[in-house]
Amino acid sequence: MLLASVPQLDRVAIQLGPFPVYWYGIIIGTGVLLGLWLATREGERLGIPKDTFVDLVLIAVPIAILFARMYYVIFEWEYYAQNPSQIINIRQGGLAIHGGLIGAVITGVLFAKRRGLSFWKLADIAAPSILLGQAIGRWGNFMNQEAHGDEVTRQFLEGLHLPDFIINQMYIEGVYYHPTFLYESLWNFAGVILLLALRKVNLRRGELFFTYLIWYSVGRFFVEGLRTDSLMLGPLRIAQVMSIGLVVISIIFIIVRRKMGQADKRYLEN
């Protein structure tokens, strides 16, 4: 009875005959399109043809989704070994951002090499777009009622001055939960603003992308500590380990590239 008194959003956006179209996919797609728009706009300003990022997205997005799913399945193999038919079922979630990032970077490196372009220039331009996509994508987790934190009271959520639709969606099987999707989404939106501002600073090439990695990783580390559905390796939360690793690697790359003279070009240079 209590569950029925809390109105919640349906994870299915529309029904096309026997096929449900989930909000998760629509939201992810929206993030990709807005990120593409942002990247093509900046790319044209820096002399990169509009179709460059369109071509890159058409290749990188499917590969990123594949890697994101593979990453998730690997760390949840105990379940998927018993349910192999569910490995390809991504309609209700199960995509790991770090896996997708690995796939996107590999694709970007190969794409840039084939086109005779600077990977670091493409990565710098794409950095705000990637973070924007991540900020929007977290709302797909919201619709799926996943990637949440520990139990809290309704009074706690009301104390955060959240709208009712968020509070109600965080009511899962009789319990209210931390809206960690929201914390990460807001952190990422703030990061987008920071990266857009840093474009005007004219950083060394590649350092805008590393700033993105550092910013995202710091936020993800703390948010992950609140989550109850983390991918685990023994006692370790995989996302926290990856976040620490990305921060350290990014700082090392910035220092080493400067010392070796590989970061002499600036963001605005052609």
UniProtKB/Swiss-Prot annotation:
What EC number(s) are associated with this protein in UniProt?
2.5.1.145
Q: Residues that bind a 1,2-diacyl-sn-glycero-3-phospho-(1'-sn-glycerol), according to the entry?
A: 138
Alphabetized UniProt keyword annotations: Cell membrane, Membrane, Transferase, Transmembrane, Transmembrane helix
- Assign the protein's first listed, main location to one coarse class: membrane
Biological process terms in GO annotation: lipoprotein biosynthetic process
The answer to keyword S-adenosyl-L-methionine applying to this record is no
Extract the InterPro entries matched here. Answer: Lgt (IPR001640)
TM segments?
A: 19-39, 56-76, 92-112, 116-136, 178-198, 206-226, 236-256
Gene Ontology annotations for the cellular component aspect, listed alphabetically: plasma membrane
List where in the cell it is found: Cell membrane
* Listed GO MF terms: phosphatidylglycerol-prolipoprotein diacylglyceryl transferase activity
Per the record, membrane topology reads: Multi-pass membrane protein
Q: Does the keyword Cell membrane apply?
A: yes
Cite the annotated pathway: Protein modification; lipoprotein biosynthesis (diacylglyceryl transfer)
What family classification does the UniProt entry report for this protein? Belongs to the Lgt family.
The task this protein performs is described as:
Catalyzes the transfer of the diacylglyceryl group from phosphatidylglycerol to the sulfhydryl group of the N-terminal cysteine of a prolipoprotein, the first step in the formation of mature lipoproteins.
User: Which HAMAP family is this protein grouped with?
Assistant: Lgt (MF_01147)
Instruction: State what protein this is by name.
Output: Phosphatidylglycerol--prolipoprotein diacylglyceryl transferase
* Originating species: Bacillus cereus (strain ATCC 14579 / DSM 31 / CCUG 7414 / JCM 2152 / NBRC 15305 / NCIMB 9373 / NCTC 2599 / NRRL B-3711)
What lineage is on file?
Bacteria, Bacillati, Bacillota, Bacilli, Bacillales
